[in-house]
């Protein structure tokens, strides 16, 4: 008997609905439905809760092959989380581009490297774009970390797409504005994000 059949049998044996079992295990009814339909397995924490609630061992719930599948799924899930956290941190690193002296201020025929707070040798429009891009990346990075912590994969996916788009546009804009230092660093940031994104895609 497969895990999904065992879970359904144990639940009906206690005369519980999927909703009632979900409340006991502190998961959603959708999760119970997915497990009972054979579309996925619970993580180790949920599996321990199921084992304790029904007073059965994990070995009784899962066959050897299912345990291997669960371990592989858990490993992929953990790696994806790590990559998501790294991605969020990369976005939040945009705060460094505000405080590092990466912009050229021309004063009396000399060019001085200054941070964005002191940068005046550009148009108000350009400054607005610089600040908007960095603020957006920082906010997206925070959102990415929060969505990962809350297991909101859909939100994380949207954040990733927005982040890649903004970073790519920022590279083009800084290059057009002839800001070599920040262009190179944002380009390297984009490469790092693409690398992490490709690794994430490989986990599916």
UniProtKB/Swiss-Prot annotation:
Provide the alphabetized UniProt keywords: Activator, Antibiotic resistance, Cell membrane, DNA-binding, Membrane, Plasmid, Transcription, Transcription regulation, Transmembrane, Transmembrane helix
Q: What is the effect of changing residue 11 to K?
A: Loss of activity. Does not affect DNA-binding and cellular localization
Any GO BP annotation: response to antibiotic
Q: Which residues bind DNA?
A: 18-37
Spell out where the chain crosses the membrane: 82-102, 127-147, 155-175, 182-202
One Gene Ontology term of the molecular function aspect: DNA binding
Per the record, what ranges lie on the membrane's Extracellular side?
Answer: 103-126, 176-181
Whether Transmembrane helix counts among this entry's keywords is yes
Cleaved signal peptide residues: none
What outcome follows a substitution of residue 33 to L? Answer: Loss of activity. Does not affect DNA-binding and cellular localization
Q: Where is the protein localized? A: Cell membrane
> Cytoplasmic topology: which positions?
1-81, 148-154, 203-204
Q: How is its activity regulated?
A: Constitutively bound to the bcrABD promoter. Requires bacitracin for activation, probably through a conformational change, such as the oligomerization of inactive dimers to form active tetramers.
What this chain does, per the entry, is described as:
Functions both as a membrane-bound sensor and a transducer of bacitracin availability to activate transcription of the bcrABD operon in the presence of bacitracin. Binds specifically to two inverted repeat sequences on the bcrABD promoter, irrespective of bacitracin concentration.
Q: What is known of its domains?
A: Contains an N-terminal helix-turn-helix DNA-binding domain, an intermediate oligomerization domain and a C-terminal transmembrane domain.
Name the record gives this protein: HTH-type transcriptional activator BcrR
